[in-house]
Amino acid sequence: MALFNFLFSRKRNTANLAKERLQIIIAKKRQNEIIPDYLPQLKYDLLQVLCKYASITPEMLSVQLEMKNGDISILEVQVIRPEMLDNNRLNNE
């Protein structure tokens, strides 16, 4: 009887553990998918400012917002410089 209880109780614990892990994964995924309303406008404004000083296209600018621990936001802006594109094209030819 103890063997019977051991086998069936373990399955419930494993299922509960898997359920909790899945809930954590889903919550993290949802947290990262939330895009603030101002982010597209921020990208547009940054592009306009950068275009004053360099020949930048929208594809050369990447803006991402990452949330950490619920109270810390990290804004990451990546800009590919036109000179870098020209150097890569010359090296690939």
Curated annotation (Swiss-Prot):
Q: Has UniProt tagged this entry with the keyword Cell cycle?
A: yes
Q: Which InterPro entries does the record match to this protein?
A: MinE (IPR005527), MinE_sf (IPR036707)
One Gene Ontology term from the biological process aspect of the record: cell division
Q: Which Pfam families match?
A: MinE (PF03776)
Top-level taxon of origin: Bacteria
**Keywords of this entry:** Cell cycle, Cell division
- Protein's job: Prevents the cell division inhibition by proteins MinC and MinD at internal division sites while permitting inhibition at polar sites. This ensures cell division at the proper site by restricting the formation of a division septum at the midpoint of the long axis of the cell.
Entry's HAMAP family?
Answer: MinE (MF_00262)
The family line of this record is:
Belongs to the MinE family.
Q: What is this protein called?
A: Cell division topological specificity factor
Origin organism of this chain? Answer: Baumannia cicadellinicola subsp. Homalodisca coagulata
Q: Which gene encodes it?
A: minE
